[in-house]
């Protein structure tokens, strides 16, 4: 979704929200949470508030009038009824045969509500320096996680990674072969953005940064001499990230054409730009997702930018066997998250079984 459209949609949701949700939004904007995250959370709050009114758990005539006391006095049974509603509600997608929302979507909804409740009961301060209320019913609501061993998850993910020689082969394919299949009209569009697209893909594969971190990169954040970029991690922490050397040529090629091709002026701070009718804009997450999906599908299998992050992490662990190093590269505070990569790189286990 283009940044301008995203901000418009956010304003539409903000216009119907209660004052305390607007307080929450402003607080999280300062962290900073990404606009994409805040947009998704606002959507979940509307879903929840609509249900409160439909279930007669509030007498408010509209969402903006739902009082804080309503949230304060909701019971565990009330929230479980909401979860049941999500699980059994008819899907809004008329082409779907599912009766309700997926567990992943339900977990996302509950995560958004947990964040709001934590803010209202722990983080915010009223005039007396106290939170708005103390009872956090969301702490009593459990989420159901997908049951899958790390080995099973690793095997599923492994098929969607560009490991070994495939990392550079993918870049080489986009650089030299992809164009050969295109019509003359499509070639023109491809050539305009070729350097930029290769720079984005190479950066994701060479650094393992999250999509949002790549989107929010500014020119000042990129040091090609040191091959280091500065990013804002989850939670608003600034971090320096090393970038593998194979991306340098692609990044330099993009910088050589960035100003001329995308009509960039001094005020255009974004590193990755798109241009429409002569106006440069920061390239958004949706556009990068589509771009990565398009090239990867033509090369081997359609993947997301997050799979490119997994690719870097797996290759780095394979080369170092250090979960600590991988967790630092990815911006994780714990090595627990990196356990997955030890299961993807399981050649030793397979060799041991073969020798039995």
From Swiss-Prot:
Q: Which GO terms describe its biological process?
A: cell division; chromosome segregation; DNA recombination
Q: Where is the protein localized?
A: Cytoplasm
Outline the extent of the Tyr recombinase domain.
Answer: 169-354
Q: Which residues form the active site?
A: 210, 234, 306, 309, 332, 341 (o-(3'-phospho-dna)-tyrosine intermediate)
Q: Which GO terms describe its cellular component?
A: cytoplasm
Q: How is its activity regulated?
A: FtsK is required for recombination.
Query: Which part of the chain is the Core-binding (CB) domain?
Result: 16-121
State if Glycoprotein is listed as a keyword.
Answer: no
Which residues span the membrane?
none
Keyword terms of this UniProt record: Cell cycle, Cell division, Chromosome partition, Cytoplasm, DNA integration, DNA recombination, DNA-binding
HAMAP family, per the entry: Recomb_XerS
- Family stated for the protein in its record: Belongs to the 'phage' integrase family. XerS subfamily.
This protein's name: Tyrosine recombinase XerS
Q: Which gene encodes it?
A: xerS
């Amino acid at each position: 979704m283009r940044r301008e459209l995203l901000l418009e949609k956010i304003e539409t949701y903000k216009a119907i929200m209660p004052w305390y949700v607007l307080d929450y939004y402003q607080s999280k904007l300062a962290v900073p949470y990404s606009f994409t995250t805040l947009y998704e959370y606002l959507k979940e709050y509307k879903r929840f508030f609509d249900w409160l009114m439909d279930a007669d758990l509030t007498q408010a005539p509209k969402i903006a009038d739902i009082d804080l006391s309503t949230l304060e006095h909701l019971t565990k049974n009330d929230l479980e009824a909401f979860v049941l509603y999500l699980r059994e509600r008819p899907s809004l997608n008329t082409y779907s045969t599912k009766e309700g929302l997926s567990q992943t979507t339900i977990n996302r909804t509950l995560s958004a509500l947990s964040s709001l409740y934590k803010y209202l009961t722990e983080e915010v301060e009223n005039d007396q320096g106290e939170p708005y209320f103390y009872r956090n019913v969301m702490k009593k609501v459990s989420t159901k996680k997908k049951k899958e061993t790390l080995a099973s998850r690793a095997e599923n993910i492994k098929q969607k990674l560009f490991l070994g020689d495939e990392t550079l082969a993918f870049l080489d394919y986009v650089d030299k072969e992809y164009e050969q299949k295109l019509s003359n009209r499509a070639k023109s569009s491809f050539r305009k953005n070729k350097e930029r697209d290769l720079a984005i893909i190479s950066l994701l594969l060479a650094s393992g940064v999250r999509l949002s971190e790549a989107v929010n990169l500014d020119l000042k954040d990129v040091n090609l001499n040191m091959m280091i970029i500065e990013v804002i991690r989850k939670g608003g922490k600034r971090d320096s990230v090393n970038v593998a050397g194979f991306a340098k040529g692609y990044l330099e090629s993009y910088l050589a054409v960035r100003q001329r091709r995308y009509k960039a002026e001094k005020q255009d701070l974004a590193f990755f730009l798109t241009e429409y009718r002569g106006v440069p804009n920061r390239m958004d997450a949706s556009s990068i997702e589509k771009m990565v999906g398009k090239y990867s599908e033509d090369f081997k299998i359609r993947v997301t930018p997050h799979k490119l992050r997994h690719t870097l992490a797996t290759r780095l662990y394979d080369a170092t066997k250090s979960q600590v190093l991988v967790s630092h590269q990815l911006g994780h505070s714990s090595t627990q998250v990196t356990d997955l990569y030890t299961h993807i790189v399981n050649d030793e286990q397979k060799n041991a079984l073969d020798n039995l």
